[in-house]
Amino acid sequence: MTIISDVYAREVLDSRGNPTVEVEVHLESGVMGRALVPSGASTGEYEAVELRDGGDRYMGKGVQKAVDNVNEKIAPELIGENALDQIGIDRLMIELDGTENKGNFGANAILGVSMAVAHAAANALDIPLYVYLGGFNAKQLPVPMMNIINGGEHADNNVDIQEFMVMPVGAESFKEALRMGAEIFHNLKSVLKAKGYNTAVGDEGGFAPNLSSNEEALATIIEAIEKAGYKPGEQVKLAMDVASSELYSKEDGKYHLAGEGKVLSSEEMVSFYEELVSKYPIISIEDGLDENDWEGHKLLTERLGDKVQLVGDDLFVTNTKKLAEGIEKGIGNSILIKVNQIGTLTETFDAIEMAKRAGYTAVISHRSGETEDATIADIAVATNAGQIKTGAPSRTDRVAKYNQLLRIEDELADLAQYNGLKSFYNLSK
């Protein structure tokens, strides 16, 4: 029933028109599982390797090498294996690759297979993916972290901070949270139009206006929240992904906020955040400092770690070794989980488990280059992570995840939980 009969990969396109890997895993029973792999714009230097072809084809971004690795190297080894043995299959692929960073086959090749195997197994058992991955205890719907103003690497504007997000913590259900986010998003469009700003959207569906400062982005979102009829700080909190590694200069060891014409030291960046947190209801800051600025992260954690979720993305890259080091040094209090940063479902789940045991939160995340694949929605519920970051309620590649969560909430019915503010269980103030 669940024995793998074929594994097949093909090159498809992501939401930015760049190639990515799609994998199908076929079982002897005739059941098939399919998965598509995402891709990031701002990437941590310690991420698993995303294999690209180089050359002229697709301007060097082709993934035919990764596709060939699946079809010619991975597939022959997996045929005859049991799709229910997720851990065994993931470990086998890691062993076959033989590198620390999956640079031989490519994390995009390995991840595509890993996710497709899980889909095939769930389909064979005729149960939802979140139930297959999480068991009977998978019932918590995540608070959405909705990116509604884009800057940095995700937009062509003069806003330095990469993402400004809203989190509807005061909702009673995921369905209500999504509605609140969508209403705020549409009101933000009206507010921006009234101010004469562009309402074109960036990679993740949020608006990308040429605002005069990062603080203006926060003030404009507050205006939109109020215009939508909600109370900032009570029903809706703010979150930011600074993606500071993109602002950091190795030459002078400073952070260059070009949009504001400022050059700041690590300590000045921490003070900058303290000022913003004192003025606005910010509950989460991601990658507030460069991925190698551990002293700066330590200072940020000491100053704000009891009242703000400090998320490590480039800092931890969904890697248990990096996370363990951060936990030991008391750096951050949360990890961003991106399946393609590490390259298998098994390692992804290991990172989530390690974070939770240490009292860190885990935020399940998309990438800026996405597809219609909604696997991360199921992962969020399977792990009871409590938070998901998957863009604005705009663009099908983002909305696909939200719609899947609506379906899951419907399926769970009375068992569904939406914890809102309680999802930030490690904040004391």
Swiss-Prot record:
Its main location: cytoplasm. Its EC number is 4.2.1.11. Transmembrane segments: none annotated. SUPFAM superfamilies: Enolase C-terminal domain-like, Enolase N-terminal domain-like. (2R)-2-phosphoglycerate binds at residues 162, 338, 367-368, 389. The active site is at 204 (proton donor), 338 (proton acceptor). Keywords: Cytoplasm, Glycolysis, Lyase, Magnesium, Metal-binding, Secreted. It catalyses: (2R)-2-phosphoglycerate = phosphoenolpyruvate + H2O. Pathway: Carbohydrate degradation; glycolysis; pyruvate from D-glyceraldehyde 3-phosphate: step 4/5. The keyword Lyase applies. PROSITE patterns: ENOLASE (PS00164). Its cofactor is Mg(2+). It is an enzyme of class 4 (lyase). Belongs to the enolase family. Catalyzes the reversible conversion of 2-phosphoglycerate (2-PG) into phosphoenolpyruvate (PEP). It is essential for the degradation of carbohydrates via glycolysis. This is Enolase.
